[in-house]
Amino acid sequence: MAADRHYQKGNPEIEPQKSVVTKSDVATFNSAESVSVPNSRYIKPEAFKIPKALFVIYSGGTEREKDYFSLIDKNTELFPFIRTAFHADPKFVKGGKPSIVRFATEKTKEYQESASKENPDHYFLITDVDHFEQFLPEMQQECNTSNIELIISNSCFEVWLYYAEKSNRPVDFVIPQNKLEISSAFKTWANTQINGGLKPTKAIFNIEQNIANAENNYVEENGFPTLFSTQMFRLAEKMLPFVKDGLEQLRSEIERRRIKHK
């Protein structure tokens, strides 16, 4: 069994952990106030409501990518049917051949040893185009062989966060001539276009809007996304049924507190 598995499928005695929404999770969504949904405002999941899905996410990025999914496992009472396991590339070398694929394939084999046929796990590898464009075809082939879905953002993960707030492609962004400078330039630019900047813990609250915007603006060439396109909507579409109700409860609680403190 993989050491990172947070639950044991098929065991009705295992109850989700207590929900704690921290200040860092929702501060960007509701000023600096932390939010914890009171027990009286939602029905606590019964013990037999164990997680039905494990989303294993591999990534070369370690900050915004991880933060985007952090709300889910920190609030297991609100999201009782899903767990996420995030693994960053332990040997990341900027500009070098990504080692995350080999790590992901080996780790996936460990997870598959304890996977449930009734509730199969989902495996995703999130990557950017910026420094890895030449390796993408090889990465795609290796991921397909290991039943891992490769999720590519061009040029970076922040394109996904951008579409959480914006419905149009970033036409005003001045594209650097050097391809390797596009990601850093876009991150700087996007932070000025969105109120409060790019915030992954805020973006997940807009997941449905995010999916629609990213899909509507998606363009690919030879099976890979073109600039300002991201495949993250494919991952988010699979995750949405497991998180939709919990996010709605959080939105309601945030709105209740906003009205209370007017």
Language model features with spans:
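N-terminal carbohydrate-binding/catalytic regions of secreted carbohydrate-active enzymes
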Residues: 50-68, 92-104
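C-terminal accessory helical subdomains adjacent to catalytic cores in phosphodiester-
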Residues: 1-53, 66, 70-90, 110-262
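Short, charged, amphipathic alpha-helix that recurs within catalytic cores of restriction-modification
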Residues: 103-111
